[in-house]
């Protein structure tokens, strides 16, 4: 992680986790993002022609669903969302869960670009969660959950990077999608 990104994450983390009400909203956003990722992964299971990737996408989708539940539970522990508000958020999320013009993220991007997207997003999450943990944010229970989730995130980063590297070796121009 570059020093500028680390500085940004450190400052943003302090604000996001220490301002009253912000931790709940941040955890809620994480829960929704993880649920959307779960749907993307299950769509990839159906769309890929690569049998070796089906198992990885399926495992990844199960992880994302579990993470969504963990983050939603942390939101409830903080006491933010009432049932009516949660239902409204859920309905909006289901309408916006990666389906654009009737196509999933995997269908719009194709497998190589999808894997590059997954790699970048998962690597960002690992960096972000590590900054939170280094700063001792926000509380012990959430930190324990982040540590558990990080184990899955490392798997996601590893398999997606391995696949991106295979596409590179096959001559596909992956650098445009990946940050250096």
Regions found by a protein language model. Give the residues of each.
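Non-heme di-metal
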Residues: 1-180
